Amino acid sequence: MEINGVQIEDTFAEGFPIKMARVVVTAVTERWALEAAREATGFGTSVIGCSAEAGIEGIVGGDETPDGRPGVNILICNMGYKNLENSLLFRIGQCILTAPTAAAFSGMPDAEKQFDTGKKLSFFGDGYQKQAEMCGRSVWKIPLMSGDFMVEQNFGAIDGIAGGNFLIFAQNQAAGLLAAESAVNAIGKIKGTITPFPGGVVASGSKVGSKYKFLKASTNTAFCTSLREDGVCTLAEDVSAVFEIVINGVSREAISAAMKAGINAACRVPGVLKISAANYEGKLGTHQFPLRAVLE
């Protein structure tokens, strides 16, 4: 299979179950909603070394937010509900409550699983916090130096999927990075997905295990072009750079749509030679996304 002359390898991406919550961050302007959202999703690339996986899902207008102000939807993901509850508490408390004019609402109010995150955060008000109703939602008003912070009492969470992915093989680093950027921009239009790595792009693909017993994962030596003379690089001679796009999503359908949009965008960039995907022969996760099926 080819798209615009780019080979699509007959392989699959391997995803795994993850718990996730959507937070609707609002503020007086889109800029401040984005500032809060960026802080709240920082240090959230992989649960291998971060407290959570997190990213910006998309910007929303006042017609889509509980308080009618500009907003940003973010997704926060953890392997278990207990860790997710802690991540919500700390990320909202340290990154959104502290942001000028920001407020935080649940983006999954109808989810079966609910955390009383807002109630716990309300104690920051030192007894002066007040409970209120807004658009049928229970919220807490916490007094701050710059005005009240509004936070919804409960935040919903669902079973999502992490680890949807594809690999971009390119003639040079510039072409590969441009293709990766184009892919991330296309994925950004797909609701229910995030690309949690820096700018949505992974430069440091990894393999399971290492020569060092204390490491669970190490650099993907087979794809490191500087290791050709060491005899461990398996890349074709015309490939000089590989970038990976990792996608977390609320459903299989969302991840499949994001992969399709991203791959098609990447294949329009000159210098892209092949699209592949990372998997662990079905040993890591229960969700498989065959590239050719996703692109049909």
Predicted features along the sequence, with ranges:
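Conserved mixed alpha/beta catalytic, RNA-binding, or beta-rich assembly cores of soluble enzyme
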Residues: E2-D10, E14, R22-E57, I74, ...
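Glycine-rich phosphate/pyrophosphate-binding loop regions near the starts of catalytic domains
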Residues: G62-G71, L75
